[in-house]
Amino acid sequence: RDLRMSRGLGDVYKRQTYADRYTGLAKLVQSDDSPDCFPFEICNYPYSVYQNLFQSLDGVIDFTTDDWADYKEAIDKFNWGGKNYCPIMSLTPTSYLWYRKSVVEEAGLDDPWELYEKGEWTWSTFMEMARKFSDPENGKYVLDGYNPENNFVCTTGTPLVSLEGGKLVSHMNDANIEKCLDMLRSFDNTQEQLRYPRDTENSWTPSYNEWADGNTLFFEDGSWRYEETWRKFKKKNKWEDDEVNFVPFPQMDGADKYYQSMKQDSIMLVAGAKNIDGYKAWIYSNLVASNDPEIAKVGREQSKEEYDWSDTLLDRIEMMNDPKTFSGVFDFKNGIGQDIASTENQDNPVEQLTKGPYMTGESYTSFRAQYQGQIDARLAELNKTVE
């Protein structure tokens, strides 16, 4: 509260349910009662700008200064129509592959983190490990989570939809994306049965218990999964500090760089916002805080004391979050309209491109043939608005 007041932001905030957040924001904008800030979400960008919910930061923030040097390359990838809207203040991998050390050892597998450190954590080593561990007749599966397929696609270095020169560009015909989704197709229970069958066994929900019981080798999720779930299993089962581990998604064989899907910490300036100076001050306060070593030190100690993080895992996270560790990939495929690209379900054209092969075993090319025309038409429609 005090920081908001000192920065001129006042002490008023609007509470909205998650499901109604954009509907509620639109009503506030239309009634000339816009809030100043709104959290950025790539799943609705740049469509949210097309809907006139946000305003450009050109003339508000100068992204050419040294303040933004670490994130300038990423910020440029979010340019829409020649304008900047996203003040990225930090980046972190969208998801990790979580695993248990003892499960890997008992299966006679190499430790994934050690493979990563040696530069040997690739698609091919991942698949070798997957096929060795998999034993569906005895309930042993390799991978679980809500969105592993999207993270894998980004390791090609090419998103399905990018922003280039301020416009949306389709890469649905990219050979490496096709290769990636052909690999993921093998995970379905109609193929090699490598993924946990959450659709038939758990009402489409990933199973934390199966991972904790050692029946699922990898679980795709963000760092918050440790705080919300894994640390509780650790305490209950009296695991050692080095039992819970994570590794980034494997590098594509032969890739020129190590690409990874990256999540952005960014706050948008709402259309019609009255307190531009307050917004700007808030952004710079967040930027300074996110890169302040003393604040990071306090946060680290809090993570250890309150959430049982180990120094080993925290060191790993710090390395993962360093802008120099990975080449960040940002996929704007879901930001072209909820009617054809909602992340809330997989039964829409955009989600079918990736979840279709992974969850049904049907080929990526069959889904592409079915939906490419509709998606390309939407991209052209949106691009026309910024010509």
Residue ranges and their predicted role:
Residues 234-307:
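Extracytoplasmic/periplasmic substrate-recognition and gating elements
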Residues 127-130, 165-203:
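Glycine-centered hinge/linker elements that transmit conformational signals in sensory
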Residues 37-38, 79-91, 95-97, 105, ...:
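Extracytoplasmic/periplasmic solute-binding protein
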